[in-house]
């Protein structure tokens, strides 16, 4: 799986394989050669009926402008069988480069070859391109395929991750684009405009972040997650504060939650904005972490600690 690929990449970097060849295949699913794929299958599948069934599947065509067009190459994207066939096709690459003694990591059509020197990596880029475009008849995107350092966070990303290095050694981290995408989604889910009811909103956030952390939990990001957690608590408090609307309602609800009358009145009648007011003592006394968690808040710091320990 993806987690094993990331672990492998980290271990290889620790052994000195710090130069990567990031290969980008142009329209991979659309360019699988049917004849090559069927010949690969025939080497392992003796029942010709199965081969013919797969052949019909491959030639079932694609939809273009509402019309089904037969195809001579490619595998129907979205088909249940397509990912398996695509993986079988690139297994030829795996076998060849294992014979050559090359260190590499592949997940689906994401291929990264590793070398200990930049010179060796450049040779690998050249030879791997020839093999993919020759015997396998695929197309390598020359503009996107490159030799980079495994620590180059701006130019090197594999399955949403990259590697970092500090005094303690090499560690896995979330790539900047992956983090930015996640935070943008959280902003959307915790927007004061979109949140009509708190519990359903918290449930959506939990579903999204549970999946995200299960995938990215292998990365080292304790401090970043704690900061993100504080930020999310604050945004949820703003959503609740907005829903209370009138000053009288705000004061009443704060008092119900145990806030002293003077602090409740001061916060409830404040003319300051949501961001400022929800940082006051009164609001934080009322909307404690424990109270929000009991309402369904998914504490990111607690969740991360749990999944990271188990990685």
Where are these regions (language model features)?
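Short hinge/gating elements
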Residues: 70-76, 188-192, 215
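A conserved non-catalytic segment of reverse transcriptases
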Residues: 59, 135-203, 208-210
């Amino acid at each position: 799986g993806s987690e094993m690929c990331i672990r492998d990449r980290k271990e290889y970097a620790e052994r000195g394989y710090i130069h990567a060849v990031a290969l980008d295949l142009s329209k991979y699913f659309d360019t699988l050669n049917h004849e090559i794929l069927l010949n690969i299958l025939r080497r392992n599948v003796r029942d010709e009926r199965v081969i013919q069934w797969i052949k019909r599947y491959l030639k079932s065509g694609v939809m273009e402008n509402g019309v089904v067009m037969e195809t001579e190459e490619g595998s129907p994207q979205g088909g249940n069988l397509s990912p398996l066939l695509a993986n079988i096709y690139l297994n030829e690459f795996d076998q060849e480069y294992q014979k050559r003694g090359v260190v590499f990591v592949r997940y689906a059509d994401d291929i990264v070859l590793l070398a200990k020197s930049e010179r060796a990596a450049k040779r690998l880029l050249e030879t791997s391109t020839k093999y993919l475009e020759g015997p396998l008849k695929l197309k390598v995107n020359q503009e996107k395929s490159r030799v980079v350092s495994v620590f180059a966070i701006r130019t090197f990303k594999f399955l949403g991750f990259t590697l970092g290095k500090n005094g303690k050694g090499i560690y896995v981290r979330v790539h900047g684009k992956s983090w930015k995408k996640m935070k943008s989604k959280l902003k959307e889910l915790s927007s004061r405009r979109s949140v009509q009811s708190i519990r359903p909103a918290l449930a959506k956030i939990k579903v999204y972040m549970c999946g995200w952390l299960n995938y990215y939990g292998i990365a080292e990001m304790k401090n970043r997650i704690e900061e993100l957690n504080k930020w999310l608590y604050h945004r949820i408090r703003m959503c609740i504060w907005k829903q209370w609307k009138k000053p009288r309602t705000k004061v009443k609800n704060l008092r119900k939650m145990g806030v002293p009358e003077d602090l409740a009145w001061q916060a409830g009648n404040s003319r300051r904005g949501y961001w400022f007011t929800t940082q006051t003592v009164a609001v934080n006394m009322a909307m404690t972490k424990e109270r929000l968690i009991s309402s369904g808040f998914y504490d990111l710091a607690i969740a991360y600690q749990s999944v990271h320990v188990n990685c």
